Amino acid sequence: MKINELSKLTAINTETIRMYRNLGFLHPEKLENGYYDYSMQDYASIIHLKKLRAFDFSL
């Protein structure tokens, strides 16, 4: 899925998703056109990160 779709599903803005990717928390496939394809595993990772943040864990 595209970053905008993932953003809508998780209620996390695209800049935060990019930061999570750059920090190595997400591992989307990079397509030939340069876009990233986020998987359901990336979705699950964001949900897990949201739970950690709710308990004041720092990233």
Residue ranges of predicted features:
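Basic helix-turn-helix/winged-helix DNA-binding cores
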Residues: 1-59
